[in-house]
């Protein structure tokens, strides 16, 4: 029986490349001349450091554009609240890895509500979809892509 897995992962190499490109762009931008601002990548999260909160917003936009250039979906970003220590502002941006249980339940409910003849089961941080016809599986892929679940999804381990 054909099956595939729905996963949500961000490639660490592409993420690091996007952060490096964003740091390079910061050093060349006119509005960041003479300003201490940087992106620090560590363990699937990026720490933004700047002197003003509006610069943090600009830095998030720079990071988003560089992620898009590297084919990393910016919807995987989850920005924490900005905090100020002295003259500098800090903000941590975490990248979602894996599908959380409540999002996985929404995916399974979305598939079952659409009455496609497939079975969806939650297996850890991924959702396995099994069906008799390849066309049904492709319909589920289109359904999950169109569903607004606040997280990017990839399809892996397609078996015929």
Swiss-Prot record:
Highest taxon, organism lineage: Bacteria
UniProt-listed NCBIfam families: PRK05412.1
UniProt xrefs under Pfam families: DUF520 (PF04461)
GO molecular function, one term: nucleotide binding
Gene3D superfamilies recorded: 3.30.70.860, YajQ-like, domain 2
Listed name of the protein: Nucleotide-binding protein VS_1405
Annotated function: Nucleotide-binding protein.
Keywords noted in UniProt: Nucleotide-binding
DNA-binding in keyword set: no
InterPro entries: DUF520, UPF0234-like_C, UPF0234_N, YajQ-like_sf
Family: Belongs to the YajQ family.
One Gene Ontology cellular component annotation held by this UniProt entry: cytosol
């Amino acid at each position: 029986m054909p099956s595939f897995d729905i996963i949500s992962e961000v490639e660490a190499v592409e993420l690091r490349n996007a952060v490096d490109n964003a740091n390079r762009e910061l050093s060349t931008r006119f509005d960041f001349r003479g300003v201490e601002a940087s992106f620090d990548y560590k363990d699937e999260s990026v720490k933004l450091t700047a002197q003003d909160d509006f610069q943090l917003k600009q830095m998030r936009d720079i990071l988003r554009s560089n992620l898009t250039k590297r084919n990393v979906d910016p919807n995987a970003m989850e920005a924490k609240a900005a905090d100020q220590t002295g003259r500098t502002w800090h903000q941590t941006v975490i990248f979602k890895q894996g599908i959380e249980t409540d999002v996985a339940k929404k995916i399974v409910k979305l598939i079952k509500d659409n009455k496609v003849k497939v079975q969806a089961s939650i297996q850890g941080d991924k959702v396995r979809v099994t069906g008799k016809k390849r066309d049904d599986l492709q319909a589920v892929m289109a359904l999950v892509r169109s569903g607004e679940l606040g997280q990017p999804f990839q399809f892996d381990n397609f078996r015929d």
